Amino acid sequence: EKHVIQINDTHPTLVIPELMRILLDVEGYSWNDAWNIVTHTVAYTNHTVLAEALERWPQGLIENLLPRIWQILKEIAARYQRTLEQHFHGDQSKVSKMAIIWNGEVRMANLCVCACYAVNGVSALHSEILKQDVFHDAYTMRPEQFKNVTNGVDHRRWLSQINPKLDALVKECTGGDDYLLHPEAIRGLEKYKDDQSVLSQLEAIKKENKRRFAAYV
């Protein structure tokens, strides 16, 4: 209810069975309750339809290195396959295309589509390609799952909340916190591009942030 785990492309997809493992083995949840939490917590963004973002891993690699994760993956895949066969009335062309484990491979993108409550591309065109081509059969099953979210960084979180000293300088130079709701107000900084006092403050803030980060690391 309070947190989301965002999967950016398929590289971190094993977070899905790992979260299941924690909920099952550490927290003692039943399978259904754990799966309910996972499928309301994890979301998936696909940035490109190239193979590098639609990873497939040899099942033997996962089985040997992560045996408990493999057990959980097999159960997720088996349950999902039963759902697919029921939904598509045994159409094996669609079932095989959407299967999580097939021909000795674990298909990470299909695992994301199975488990994530939201799937999005990063532009209107890209999102349409996902719906009409890459994940078309999944889209016909759960059209509400597929969304379009433009990629970007939100200044309220990544500037105001996380960098309070820079936030204070921006507010001082632009006349208050108007930029939080109207980011175009940041253009007010342009008039200080040759102001050595402001530039010195900016440099000092950057150095201090780097020192704090280095100390943390």
Language model feature labels by segment:
Residues E1-V217:
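A conserved ligand/cofactor-binding region detector
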